[in-house]
Amino acid sequence: MLLGASLVGVLLFSKLVLKLPWTQVGFSLLFLYLGSGGWRFIRVFIKTIRRDIFGGLVLLKVKAKVRQCLRERRTVPILFASTVRRHPDKTALIFEGTDTLWTFRQLDEYSSSVANFLQARGLASGDVAAIFMENRNEFVGLWLGMAKLGVEAALINTNLRRDAQLHCLTTSRARALVFGSEMASAICEIHASLDPSLSLFCSGSWEPNAVPTSTEHLDPLLKDAPKHLPICPDKGFTDKLFYIYTSGTTGLPKAAIVVHSRYYRMAALVYYGFRMRPNDIVYDCLPLYHSAGNIVGIGQCLLHGMTVVIRKKFSASRFWDDCIKYNCTIVQYIGELCRYLLNQPPREAENQHQVRMALGNGLRQSIWTNFSSRFHIPQVAEFYGATECNCSLGNFDSQVGACGFNSRILSFVYPIRLVRVNEDTMELIRGPDGICIPCQPGEPGQLVGRIIQKDPLRRFDGYLNQGANDKKIAKDVFKKGDQAYLTGDVLVMDELGYLYFRDRTGDTFRWKGENVSTTEVEGTLSRLLDMADVAVYGVEVPGTEGRAGMAAVASPTGNCDLERFAQVLEKELPLYARPIFLRLLPELHKTGTYKFQKTELRKEGFDPAIVKDPLFYLDARKGRYVPLDQEAYSRIQAGEEKL
């Protein structure tokens, strides 16, 4: 702005006052421009203009399609119906576990059976039904069938047990629960605490003695249900589709609301931004209860007619064999998955596949080039975006290490920003005018996205819990009176506008591809340790993605039955949430508001040369906590100890 005003001033002064010829005026302006650092702008412009134009066109295309869907009140089931009409007999889903193949027509008929059956059982538009099962074709057919009826699906994380699992079912107010037979034991554990009015249905192998007494076998009931489309509910593009549970920033899992427009937007931005094709075949081994697997992956099938291969769980040893068997051209990943593949011994299969794109997030810069070159993958399509966020990013031109970009030239087109935060408290830093201070290139800051509720691409749908929404929204961020979504993630932007993931703030960290809520883990550990003070945080471990969980426990005597503690943890917490490291110390220091001071604990980490308190780590082979001495620390640092 200042540079522009200066140029105009020089132009007027040179021409009107000095009466110089236009050639001299031009040289004067060029001299001033370059002298004021304008050459940086020219450099950025030349290097990024093609990228920015392409990104802008993608944004405009998706925005136009979203507006059309809004006008015509289209929903995901309506959009899927048009996909079925285009190619009814094309393969839609393949389940690797049984080689079960569903065409688009079969998926359509199965989902309609689900809708008609639930309608016959009294469920109606606006009701909620929960799904608790491992990956398979039926998972997609179930929530899609619910959507056809206007019933909102609550997609429960299959790793959750007991309190967390019960919390998800209770807060969703589900009237029905469909669970896979493989999850029967987990349902039996909480059956006594479930609402007696909750209808229970089991899909898969049927053993009456292995499920709660009130459970019905769903599969034969669906075979008898009508396969025609039920009467369409009065739903619009901004109405609720389903709920995905996320740890958010604190506490037990929260239900993030996914509306039809959000589902479309997330899938479409990936499709157009990374130049996908309708004849691509996607290999999806990510959990379908998360947005990466169910929206970014399955969304390409439902909305764009791709074939998606579903795997129950990721297998490093079978990964490339599967890709060859099913002729996959796109694979989905999380950063940890890529490291597992690189740790596998070389094999012929990794050179015989047809994969042209790896799509996902969390791939570290240190292994990025090695991953793409060893496995001969031309395009790494890295993106950033939580289920509930309004500031998704895409690395459309495969810049190594970047999770996306924002134009330095036309930054106002996509209103996101990195803002300064206090390193210790993670509070937003504001200027004298009360507005958040934007970061300069190279300066880490929290990513925020401006909220515009009337714009489907900028709206924040939030969580079912209003209190959780309040914690994710800040005011006066871009300008006075506005609102912005707080991602809780620290990124850094380079001079060209590429964004790189740095850290996860708030009270979560990421481990084994899952967000771990420190508050939830702290509560569980404290309860198991007779309400001792416990601080949980993530620590970096060389050669691994994310942060490993570490728990600092206030234990004045230093005594703890760690063997029994490890056994109980197996029943109370999913594997990814169990602390890898333990630190026993006399007391935990707190802030004036009784929050644990974790900054120093994080900095000290688990190095026995720095930490003088007793340290322990979870030995994966022994299944218990053992002392962490200098020798064990060296093995962990060298990657010789499995965590």
Curated annotation (Swiss-Prot):
EC class (word): ligase
Record-linked Pfam families: AMP-binding, AMP-binding_C
Species this chain originates from: Pongo abelii (Sumatran orangutan)
Main function: Mediates the import of long-chain fatty acids (LCFA) into the cell by facilitating their transport across cell membranes. Appears to be the principal fatty acid transporter in small intestinal enterocytes. Also functions as an acyl-CoA ligase catalyzing the ATP-dependent formation of fatty acyl-CoA using LCFA and very-long-chain fatty acids (VLCFA) as substrates, which prevents fatty acid efflux from cells and might drive more fatty acid uptake. Plays a role in the formation of the epidermal barrier. Required for fat absorption in early embryogenesis.
Gene Ontology process terms (BP): long-chain fatty acid import into cell; medium-chain fatty acid transport
Name of protein: Long-chain fatty acid transport protein 4
Ranges in a coiled coil: none
Lineage of origin: Eukaryota, Metazoa, Chordata, Craniata, Vertebrata
Reactions it catalyzes: a fatty acid(in) = a fatty acid(out); (9Z,12Z)-octadecadienoate(out) = (9Z,12Z)-octadecadienoate(in); (9Z)-octadecenoate(out) = (9Z)-octadecenoate(in); hexadecanoate(out) = hexadecanoate(in)
PROSITE patterns according to UniProt: AMP_BINDING (PS00455)
